[in-house]
Amino acid sequence: MSAARQAIASARSVVVKIGSSALTSLEGGLDTTRLDRLADAVEARMRAGSDVVVVSSGAIGAGLAPLGLSRRPRDLATKQAAASVGQLALAHAWGTSFARYGRTVGQVLLSADDFSRREHHRNAQRTLDRLRSLGAVAVVNENDTVATEEIRFGDNDRLAALVAHLVGADALILLSDVEGLYDGDPRKGAATFIPEVRSSADLDGVIAGSGGVLGTGGMASKLSAARLAADAGVPVLLAAAEQAATALGSGTVGTAFAARPVRLSARKFWVRHAADSRGALVLDDGAVQAVAQRRRSLLAAGITAVRGRFHGGDVVDLLAADQRLVARGVVEYDSTELSTMLGRSTTELPDTMQRPVIHADDLVKV
């Protein structure tokens, strides 16, 4: 068994993400029989000594039938209406299922704002920690009724990876309608199964497709979530929901993704993955090389353009001349100040403007 699988099987703190397709039927509504089997697997892992946080999709799918809808809506207002109905059904179903074991369920609805704003981040962390300490099962979902772009977040794959970092999880398990990672689409022809991903080199040639009828998360979102979790030092198991008992038990199914050897610091993880970008700086070739290759601080001399309105302390994107995103960082100056500093060497600037635009400690290559 690989080191990643051993880490997943022995993890004391686990986040389990369950996709829409694993919880809802094509006819609409929740499939409570399948949900009960998933709750059984989670309960078994908890009785084995692990803390488990469940990230559950399915709110929109659960709201379709009660509203007389036959298919997943495309417009935002109807999605949010379906989510508002489905959240009640989803929370009730999880509560009923875990009540068989005397477990209490707490519903936690999060949005991207809760990760990008430090105060929200801390509050969510404290809530989840307290629920676990009280022996309750935290069931997390995205707050679809107020989300905009986030409603297309990738069927909660990215949310699950962020939650894994938030609670300091030792493993992330993604359960959906796929058995793991393939180098092509197994539904369309021959494809080779990939049991282990040790580094990005193992992903060469992998084709990432879109999700199923009821979900929004295809393989692309799962790969993105696995990379995000790896940055946080969390190994990931991607497996079929039908194999939940084995996935949460021995971990001998699906595809295992190894965590990066050296995890990003909490601050750099936040800069790279969680914080909202408030603007962008366009860099010349020398500055791109300095920040992306040599990990140097960004100086005003290497900036050719400022985009957006932002303040000192905000996170901004760093772009090459061809608009390619090369890094993100916490900027020291307001956008109005920076506009007067473009292309000027440090010695040409007033004493109050001789700090780096972004210090190397606040820069993260992407």
Curated annotation (Swiss-Prot):
Q: What is its EC number?
A: 2.7.2.11
What are the record keywords, sorted? Amino-acid biosynthesis, ATP-binding, Cytoplasm, Kinase, Nucleotide-binding, Proline biosynthesis, Transferase
**Pathway as given in its UniProt record:** Amino-acid biosynthesis; L-proline biosynthesis; L-glutamate 5-semialdehyde from L-glutamate: step 1/2
Q: Which Pfam families match?
A: AA_kinase, PUA
Its main subcellular localisation, reduced to a broad class, is cytoplasm
Residues covered by the PUA domain: 278-352
Q: Which GO terms describe its cellular component?
A: cytosol
Residues holding ATP: 17, 176-177, 216-222
Q: What GO terms describe the biological role, i.e. biological process, of this protein?
A: L-proline biosynthetic process
Q: Which GO terms describe its molecular function?
A: ATP binding; glutamate 5-kinase activity; RNA binding
Known catalytic reactions? L-glutamate + ATP = L-glutamyl 5-phosphate + ADP
Stored SMART domains = PUA
Supply the Gene3D superfamilies for this chain: Acetylglutamate kinase-like (3.40.1160.10), PUA domain (2.30.130.10)
Compartmental location: Cytoplasm
Transmembrane stretches, start-end: none
Q: Which InterPro entries match?
A: AceGlu_kinase-like_sf, Asp/Glu/Uridylate_kinase, G5K_ProB, Glu/AcGlu_kinase, Glu_5kinase, Glu_5kinase/COase_Synthase, Glutamate_5-kinase_CS, PUA
* Entry's family note: Belongs to the glutamate 5-kinase family.
> What is the protein's given name?
Glutamate 5-kinase
